[in-house]
Amino acid sequence: MAKDLRIVTVSLWEIIKIHSLTFVFGVWIMCKMSAKWVWDPKSFFTLQQRDTPPACLVDSSLGQHKYVKLKGVKFHYVECGSRDLPLVLLLHGFPDCWLSWRHQIPVLSQHFRVVALDLKGFGDSDKPSSRKTYRIDMILEELQQLIISLGVSSCTVVGHDIGGLLGWCLAHQFPELVDKLVAVSCPHPNVYRTSLHTSSNYRWLNFVQLPYFPEVDALREDVKIISKYHKHLPPHDTYLEAYKYAFCRKEDWTGPLNYFRNLLFIEVAENSRTIQVPVVLITGDRDKFIKLESIVKSTDYCEKFQVKIVDGARHFPHQERHQQFNEILLKSLVKKKSVEDGGLERSASKGIVNRMFGAVSSTVKYGNSVLDTVHKKTNGVVGSIPTINLLSYANIYDRTDS
């Protein structure tokens, strides 16, 4: 439990429910694993030998590879850009490493000092095996020390997936450290936890609470889970091979899985203040892991926010549609927009609302939830989804309250 009770442990009932589902889904998935092993044992245990890191993992063309030791833990990061510029801290997701931001580092470094971190347990950072070393309070304190060690008092945090969850928590726990938060393919932690039952990998999230077996399962069929998550990369792609190299040992999975073994048991205290700094939520319109409904609900925890949708992207919009993503990112972080009508940026929101309501109309089961959010944010003015003039409600998805 983090100090000041901003990040708290979930209720006893939630803990019991998670452990119960862990047993149920754990037994089910292990039975499936056993059946696959019996049917084709050679394919099940196939694991290509990978002793040499691909050049892209050690290449310095994207920036300098650096290390810092915090509380006895070594962190690896890649830094690019002038030290006189504002700092942008990039936090990757799962299963990934600093290389996740290969398309963003060159672009951002023209305007910022960029640090792409290997989270603890990932990449070339240390990989302690103990689950307790991945408690949220320890992770956040290490991120706090990292930012301070870089010689700044605050920075912009851009996080994807797990990195986004950590960014949300950092903005709540240490608001003085975060100038702006960009959460990519990642709803607010409270929304993430409450919407897990609708997630396509719900069973897997419960299964990974077990010890040892999830690590073994991740290695089967030559680290097939990497290909599953990184479907946007073709077979034998250089970057796909780099990810498989980074996750080719059992100990390479213990740390990453320990994040899930801890994050499912925490939430932001309901009496905490909403996040005061600007928040940009970016998601792909084809993401199967994160629902659009969850992104919209996450704005309840923000005073100032923008919601941006990357067309044609799934869970990795910063890689799959990196040009469109970079344009959104730079526009949010660098370019000054004209503000009209009491601080509401209408023009930037028009495309979002069109796609938002388009998504709602084609996905009926989420319509009521999005409508409830619209109703709430307009203080009851909007009671139903209109069939015409949808753009007149653009401001509710791009709020810059003073």
Regions found by a protein language model. Name each.
Residues 99-102, 168-172, 326:
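Short, hydrophobic alpha-helix immediately C-terminal to the catalytic nucleophile
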Residues 100, 119-122:
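Recognition helices and adjacent regulatory flanks at domain boundaries
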Residues 2-66, 72-88, 115, 122-158, ...:
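Flexible "cap/lid" subdomain of the alpha/beta-hydrolase fold that forms the substrate-access gate
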Residues 93, 320-321:
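Active-site helix-initiating loop/hinge in glycosyltransferases
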Residues 103-112, 149:
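A short, Lys/Arg-enriched amphipathic alpha-helix followed by its capping loop at the start of a domain
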Residues 84-85, 95-103, 114:
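Serine-hydrolase catalytic-loop signature spanning alpha/beta hydrolases and amidase-signature enzymes
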Residues 106, 117-120:
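N-terminal cap/lid subdomain of alpha/beta-hydrolase-fold enzymes
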